[in-house]
Each structure stands twice: as C-alpha cells, then as structure tokens.
UniProtKB/Swiss-Prot annotation:
Molecular function terms, GO-annotated: organic anion transmembrane transporter activity; symporter activity
Protein's UniProt keywords contain Transport: yes
Subcellular location, record wording: Cell membrane
Summary of the function given for this chain in its UniProt record: Mediates the transport of the dicarboxylates fumarate, malate, and succinate across the cytoplasmic membrane via a Na(+)-electrochemical gradient.
Annotated organism of origin: Staphylococcus aureus (strain MRSA252)
Membrane protein topology class: Multi-pass membrane protein
Biological process according to GO: carboxylic acid transmembrane transport; sodium ion transport
One GO cellular component term noted in the UniProt record for this chain: plasma membrane
Family the entry assigns: Belongs to the SLC13A/DASS transporter (TC 2.A.47) family. NADC subfamily.
Organism superkingdom: Bacteria
UniProt keywords, alphabetically: Cell membrane, Ion transport, Membrane, Sodium, Sodium transport, Symport, Transmembrane, Transmembrane helix, Transport
Pfam families per record: Na_sulph_symp
This protein's name: Sodium-dependent dicarboxylate transporter SdcS
C-alpha cells in the first residue's frame, strides 16, 4: 500500500512538473500573450471591416465575439472558464440577448446533469467504491499478461463512463505501476528484460487510452458529449436520451477497447512474457486490504444503480406517466445528488453523511461554466441571424458525399484536439456543424456526433488530454513513443467512429441521415 501511495504522489508531482517547467512563473507565456492581444484585435477588425450585404449587423457582432472567445479558448490566454464568462458581458452589450436570457443558459438542464454526475463520481471516490470495482474486474479476468492488460482496460473504461476520464486514470495508474514493480521484483532468470519493459509500456498506455475511450460510453462520460447534447437541443429542439446514447456508445467503447488491446499487445509492444509473476496475488492482496464492502459503499452502489436505471428507463417509462413526464436527465442527476446529501454515514469519524458540502471544493466548476458559455454563445449565434447566414455560405458543399464530409470532420477534429482542449474544441466546432448540416441537407447528428466523439479521442501528446499527461508523468513512456503509438490509435478511432455514426447510430436513434432538421 505504501508503494501505491508513493507512486500516486510521484505521478502528481510529475504531472504538475510537466506543466510548470520553471519555478519562476511568468504572467503569460508567449502563446498566451499573442492570444490575449489577437482575440480583441480580431473582434475590432471584424466589426470595422467585415460587412457582407446579407448579414445583419447583429450577426457581424456575434461573429466578432465568437472569434474573440475562440481565440482565447484555443490559446488559453486567460483560464478557459473565465473566457466562458465573456458572453454574459458581450451579448447584452450588442443587444443580442438580455442579461436574463444569457444567464439562463448557464443553468441549463444539461449542466445540472453533469453536476449530478460529478457528485455521484465523488461519492464513489470518497468511499473507495471505484477501487473495489476496478480490482474486482481485473481479478475476474485473469493473471496472464494479455488478460491483465485487458482487465485494466475494461476496468478503466468502465470507470470512465461514470467518473471523469482523469479520475479513472488516476485511480488505475498507481495499481498498474505496483504490478509493474512486482513484475521486476519477481522476474525469473529466463525472463527477457525487454519483454517486461514492453509490457510496462503497453500497460501504462492501455490505462490512459482506456480512460479516454470509456468516456464515449455515456453522455456524462466526457465533456464533448454533454456539449453535443446541449448544442443539439439548443439548435434543433431535439433531445438525445441517456439510454439511447448508451446503445450507441457502449458498443463503440467495447470495439475500440478490443482493437486497441490487440494493437498494444500484439503489434505495438509484442513480447514473450505470457504470465506475470505475482500479478494475480497482488490484486487479491489489494482486494483483501479493502475488506468486506462497507455500509457507505453499499449505499453509493445502490444509488449508482438507481441513477442508471432512471436514466435508462426515462424515455420509455417515466415519460409515459403524467407525474414524471417532464423529468429530464438533469432532474434525475440532482435528485440522486440530494439523496446522497440526505443519507447518513455510519463512519462518522470521516463524514456525517454520504456526501456533504465539502464536495463543493472538488467539483470542476470551471467545466460547468464552460458548458454555459458555449450554450450562451450558441443562442447568440442563432438569435443574431449568424447561423442562417453561415448556412447560406456553406451551400456550396451541397452535393458533396455525406460520408466524405464525415471522414474529413472526424480526422480534422481528432488531430485538432491533440493541441487544444477537447471541451473547447467541441464548444467551437459543434455550432458550425449544426449550421453546416442544414446547408448540405443532412441530419445534424451525422456531422455533430463524430465531431464530439473525435474531440474526446486524443492519444498522441501529453497535452492532448489529462489522461495522457498522467501516463506520461509515470516516467514509463516517452513523448516519441506516445506519438507513434497514439497516431495509429487515432486512425483506429477515426475508422470506428465513422462506421458507428454512419451505419449504427441512425438505426439506434431512429434518424434519417439524409433528412436535415430546421434550425430553431
């Protein structure tokens, strides 16, 4: 257990060191300083010199603030969450929306869905249920190196459907490093050292990649999918249900995990180490250290199952009853959260109830503000006439094969998100694609869904996504190795996303990909 804690501390230090090389911090990096100036400059230049005849002044104004906000999001000139507050100032100034209309977008149902999801995830982490679930999955799968690799991927992928990708990887990487240490300590005389090194690299990357892949399974698994749900509702007035997305997302996760596992085990890091000395023993030892499931764990497990059932059955059960017909996914998330605040804990030395307001310190408020900013900006784009104008300009793409557009969008976003925040990428790209769908005459989800899924899938660089930074911080993998392996996982993801969106999603969601929806 000491080794486990030691490595968790080591990862945190390396993770922080990666992002802060120098002790003497400058107020702005060169890139941030350029972005800080470029954003307002683009705003002014657009207002002064961009006046197309068929775009009203309000549309020009919203385009100008979109360029400003997008520039600050990409360069992170100021914190992304702070940039996301700009619509509250700029949209009323241009008489696009009233302050009340703008502010209401920051309290959208989608934001409360994610807030409730965060609270449930923190409850799992507080009472260590997440660790028990992960270790149990690994223990059940087996002791060969291939099965251990698969076990870690399944456990991490499952966790990241319900807790953040970052949290899932932070939970699993110390356990993985403990197994790697055990492999080195117990290696037999005839064991090839190169094989152990290949196994450790494959295991570290498997954990990071599975954390990213698993987020695609549910609407609360990763921010880009929450943004997809919100933008789709904002632009077209239609809803993506939690249950239906799981029918699309979970098979995608299973296929991606399976192919990535095969690639890591038999192509990228092929080795001769078939069984890991002491691997299964170590997992069982850690399970024994957890002891029997405690009261608080049972409560969180029950609440988790209840939340899942309510989300899954809302479309075909709750909507049929008059009393619950108006219940949304966010309503369920907050109901579940309130239950966690009410139910008392037995281990009162730690906490009086399952969750208390101390949880507020751990909640990612910045992410929630970013969602709100994206929704407010989307409403401004719609209300100002900018969305309609963009659609007219994009009509030149009419006649281009929809599958070709999907391929270009998926690959473009996949590689863009390697150097930009996945949340900011989705927030910027999805409103444009909503308009593009009308212009080219296809269903909006045909363009928006692959972009949101691709925005989540960054595998090449440590800066691409926090899970990548965490596994890089383990010291077991170099940037060059991550980039070369991640490039192929990017391409695998692109192929799977395109196939799922084009052939499976329309059947599951009951949509006609060649039938556009009118903008609200």
């Amino acid at each position: 257990m000491a080794y486990f804690n030691q490595h968790q501390s080591m990862i945190s230090k390396r993770y922080l060191t990666f992002f802060s090389k120098s002790k003497k911090k400058k107020p702005f990096s060169t890139g941030q300083l350029i972005g800080l100036i470029l954003g307002p400059l683009l705003f002014l230049l657009t207002l002064l010199f961009f006046h197309p005849q068929d775009l009203p002044w309000k549309g020009v104004y919203v385009l100008a603030i979109t360029l400003w906000i997008a520039t600050w999001w990409i360069t992170e000139a100021i914190p992304i969450a702070a940039t996301s507050l700009l619509p509250i100032v700029l949209l009323p100034l241009g008489h696009i929306l009233t302050p009340e209309q703008v502010s209401s977008e920051y309290g959208n149902d989608i934001i409360f869905l994610f807030l409730g999801g965060f609270i449930l995830a923190i409850a799992m982490e507080r009472w260590n249920l997440h660790t028990r679930v992960a270790l149990t999955i690994i223990n059940l799968i087996g002791a060969s190196t291939s099965k251990i690799l698969l076990g870690f991927m399944v456990a991490t992928g499952f966790l990241s459907m319900f807790v953040s990708n970052t949290a899932a990887v932070m939970i699993m990487i110390p356990i993985g490093l403990a197994i790697i240490k055990e492999a080195h300590d117990l290696q037999e005389a005839n064991t090839n050292q190169t094989s152990i090194q290949k196994f450790e690299k494959s295991l570290v990357l498997a954990i990071g990649y599975a954390g990213t892949i698993g987020g695609l399974g549910t609407l609360i698994g990763t921010p880009p999918l929450i943004i997809l749900k919100g933008q789709y509702m904002q632009h077209f007035g239609h809803e993506i249900s939690f249950a239906k997305w799981m029918i699309v997302g979970i098979p995608t996760v299973i296929v991606l995990l399976g192919i990535t596992w095969l690639y890591l085990r038999y192509v990228a890091f092929r080795h001769d180490l078939k069984y890991l000395p002491g691997g299964q023993t170590l997992i069982k030892q850690k399970l024994d250290e957890l002891g029997k499931m405690k009261y608080e764990e049972k409560v969180v497990q029950t609440i988790f199952v209840l939340a899942s059932l309510l989300w899954i059955t809302r479309e075909f059960l709750l909507k049929k009853w008059e009393v619950t017909s108006s219940v949304a996914d966010g309503t369920i998330a907050i109901f579940i959260s309130i239950l966690l605040f009410i139910i008392p804990a037995k281990n009162t030395e730690k906490h009086r109830r399952i969750i208390d307001w101390e949880v507020a310190k751990e909640l990612p408020w910045g992410v929630l503000i970013l969602f709100g900013g994206g929704l407010a900006l989307a409403k401004g784009i719609s209300e100002s006439g900018l969305a309609k104008w963009l659609g007219e300009q994009l009509k030149s793409l009419n006649g281009v094969s929809p599958i070709l557009i999907v391929i270009v969008i998926t690959i473009f976003v996949l590689f863009l998100t390697e150097v930009t925040s996945n949340t900011a990428t989705a927030t910027m790209i999805l409103p444009i694609l909503a308009t593009l769908s009308v212009a080219v005459g296809v269903h909006p989800l045909l363009l928006m869904a692959p972009a949101a899924m691709a925005a989540n899938c960054a595998y090449m660089l440590p800066v691409g996504t926090p899970p990548n930074a965490i596994i890089f911080g383990s010291g077991k993998i170099s940037i060059k190795q991550m980039a070369s392996v991640g490039f192929w996982v990017n391409l695998i993801s692109a192929i799977i996303i395109i196939l799922v969106v084009y052939y499976i999603m329309p059947i599951v969601l009951g949509i006609d990909i060649n039938q556009p929806l009118p903008l609200k």
